[in-house]
Amino acid sequence: RAANAFFSSNFDEALIVTIDGGGRDYDKNGNVVITTFTIWKGEGNKIKPIMIIPIEKLNLGVMWQLCTTNIFGLSGGYPKGNQAGSVMAMAVMGDPSEHYEYFKTYGGNIQHTNFDFARLQKLASESEEQRFNIAAAMQKVTEDIVRSIILKYAKQYPSKNLCLAGGVVLNSVMSGKMFDWFKDI
């Protein structure tokens, strides 16, 4: 994904970010790693990995998929397609404060924890406001995690260009905010 994003961009150099539910990448030593969040530096006809987060450390894509299906009862894929976008739409109408700390505690890594889907599913079924607030908390935690990681590496590897790839960057609300987070994108 990093190569596709960079080499199809027409940039001579760029910081490249991939965020998804899981992909195969190579670490700096050439070992295959299942990853969910990577940052690369592209220059000329080469890209090199700068930062790789393995699937067991962070997985925002799986967080969205599991919450979409287990809390909101929507499709996470086949046969109806992934309806995480519907949850993202709910997020803009909610207040993240009530559930933010709970999602922040798990830091986008809910598949390896004792995340309480049943409690949140019950709350979501009680009112539209709760559905919107839960979605807003997911959205805010996603944005905060992505922003903090990208900004850290953007300072270390400055570039006027940013290439994005992966399912999580299809989060249009978050991607739109990236224009506020970074100058000259």
Predicted features and spans:
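Short acidic/glycine-rich loops and adjacent helix/strand connectors
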Residues: R1-I185
